[in-house]
Structure formats: C-alpha cells, structure tokens
Amino acid sequence: MGRSLKKGPFIADSLLRKVEKQNDNDDKSVIKTWSRASTILPMMIGHTIAVHNGRTHVPVFITEQMVGHKLGEFAPTRTFKGHIRDKKGGR
C-alpha cells in the first residue's frame, strides 16, 4: 500500500538539500546517505548516491527507471552464500 497523495513522497531533508545544492552547482560528486527509506525523485537522475547497507555505503547511480522507488531497494543488506550441499550425495 502506497503513501497518501496529499502527503507526497518521503525524502530526508538533508538528502534533498544536498541534491539541490549539487544541481545548482552542476556538481555530480557522490552523496553519502543512511536514509534507505527516501523515495527517488526526478531531480536525482544522473547523481550517484552511496546508500548504507548496514556495513558499507553502496554506490547507486540513479536512472529514469528508478524514479518512484526507494533508495534501500538498490542496496542489498544480506549476502547470499548459496545453499549447502548434501554430505551423503544423491540417492
């Protein structure tokens, strides 16, 4: 279930200020953020945002297809190492 239209999309104020500042200066340096719940807006297209996954910051390059999604969707928090093999072999 999505967020109410009258409220608008959620984006952290600090992240919004950093993106607007870079857009004014035509700067495309990496922006670090811990806000995985922030929605990707059209003004972020072309920026690289380093999203925290609990251990490190994962760089995410924002494209048009990502608009409307959350930043946390593109920074996985779990590493899948594969299923363990049977010790007995195949029966």
Curated annotation (Swiss-Prot):
One of its GO terms (biological process) is translation. SUPFAM superfamilies: Ribosomal protein S19. The keyword Ribosomal protein applies. The keyword Zinc does not apply. Keywords: Ribonucleoprotein, Ribosomal protein, RNA-binding, rRNA-binding. InterPro entries: Ribosomal_uS19, Ribosomal_uS19_bac-type, Ribosomal_uS19_CS, Ribosomal_uS19_SF. GO terms for cellular component: cytoplasm; small ribosomal subunit. Pfam families: Ribosomal_S19. PROSITE patterns: RIBOSOMAL_S19. One of its GO terms (molecular function) is structural constituent of ribosome. Belongs to the universal ribosomal protein uS19 family. Protein S19 forms a complex with S13 that binds strongly to the 16S ribosomal RNA. This is Small ribosomal subunit protein uS19. It comes from Synechococcus sp. (strain CC9605). The lineage of its organism: Bacteria, Bacillati, Cyanobacteriota, Cyanophyceae, Synechococcales.
